[in-house]
Amino acid sequence: MKEPKVQVGILFEPQIKFILLTPYHINGEEVSGKQIVTYHNGHILWQGHSYDELLFEPLHEKSDAFELQDVTIGINFHWERKENQRFIGALKIIVENKKLTGINVIHVEDYLTSVISSEMSATASLELLKAHAVISRSWLLAGLSLPYSKDREKSNTTPEKVPYSTSSSPLLAQEAENKILIRWYERDAHTHFDVCADDHCQRYQGITRASTDMVRQAISATRGEVLMSEGTICDARFSKCCGGAFEEFQYCWENIRHPYLSKQRDSKKATDLPDLCKEAEAERWIRTSPEAFCNTKDKKVLSQVLNNYDQETTDFYRWKVEYEQEELSKLILKRSGIDYGQILDLVPVERGTSGRLVRLKIIGTKRTMIIGKELEIRRTLSPSHLYSSAFIIDKVNVTNGIPDRFILTGAGWGHGVGLCQIGAAVMGEQGYTYDTILLHYYIGATIDKLY
């Protein structure tokens, strides 16, 4: 198999400013320097001419570079901000949803060098970096083997399968009438490129985050290696902190069980895990701080996984959020577009194997509804995202059935499926090799070399 290329959606704006730092060619002409492209009447306006698509290809691939200005990172997360970013490879610009989309076309291994440096600190241990290289490559190539989402969405329209970004869908309206809103979010949102550059897919910030010799060594040592299960590349999901227990795929996304993404405790005693689908066990688990690889406050280890903006978060293994009644009711209205009135209760309906809520009943004075899955719950109950949906609810000062305040006590950061980045960092520090780390988180998988 030849090393493939990947198309990464970077920027989505009415106008894109960029600098070609080395010579590029387009339509047989050589160009460089500062450029501005603007959306105009369904087309791309560049240098006084109108285009349907632009493709700037490097004249010399080994020394190519361009810079995109005002790229938003951390979209809808608490660390959202803009920065200028540099990339290698080609730059494609297309029209999408009355805006312009800037797409980086790049070889997979070059893409991975950036992902590892963007997702994690470049000072991480070699074994951790090698493990992350394999899962990032696996996740990417598993997705590249599928058609773009426009074709896949057709098979996702059942009452339990609401595709990403369908707020005006007739199906969604039907679900609302039935007082159930179940939605999950996938890379299926991307129609004209393979992956985006933010946390919805994998963090990709080009060569903005300087890669080290260690990162390049990790990519080279694992070149072409992927996780496999039953002859198929694994959909190798990962999150920041599982909270001590692995979640299973079907509780977060489509109702399909992947055997390599199974429940397990994130510790040496991997089989010693309570049944966290049960409310009493989940509450006991979340209110305490069980031993786990990811239960650490070691700043040296955390700095390997958390970039500067991630380190703005200090509590992730166990955390707490409090809302006043008025604050919560307004927040839910703003985030969901549904007026529940005053919030009387938040009731767990279903939990996954890590204790994460899959379905949550919101009881209000005007409306009651069950929502899910985990990311929909996290988005509804936070101005950006709750750290996870593994939380329990305490009501404070209840008068005439109406609480003055809600306290959410939670566990972990992210969906908890697959590799736990903080847990893997601890394993690397404790001397575990990358293959041992991978097979701890992807149960029964194998590591195969594709190219």
Predicted regions and their residues:
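Conserved, single-site charged/polar hotspot
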Residues: 1-451
